[in-house]
């Protein structure tokens, strides 16, 4: 178990160094790689109940869990007020940190956005990954970005109300944020305390 943890941490450090390019190095006087927590995205454990999931993560040496709180996830949005506290309790009882959840939130006016944000804030969870945004093929790229800029502005406002941070995960391909310059346009006027990119 310990060698797996070291492999994950060392690999993450190496990949980070490669990704950030020249001029970035780990200093022996700086952050110790052993102090970097390793979290697991729980999507692959959705077949387990909360206690079983927590036991597996603890047995495998993970420090934290990015819990799937979305359609098809461990916690369904319609059950968030009841099930998220149960999931967090099981994780924390197993010594697993729950500082982030993964959601499908991409609309501040969706019926589940506020209940999810309230539930996570009540549990002391400060970060969530929000859902993807798609381009409307009937609109130009600049028109799409202007529409999504309004979405980011509204999500920032709702996040501020609950004291949480939403991070957009960009993926390559045809989704908004695939070309990373989209994100500059969407985030340049936003407060990074409440909204950003993961």
Can you annotate each of these PLM segments?
Residues 54, 149-152, 180, 184:
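Extracytoplasmic/secreted envelope proteins and their assembly/folding machinery
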Residues 122, 154-157, 161:
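Alpha-helix capping at helix-to-loop junctions
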Residues 138-152:
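Active-site cleft segment of glycoside hydrolase catalytic domains centered on the general acid/base Glu
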Residues 159-198:
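Acidic/histidine-rich catalytic cores of soluble enzymes
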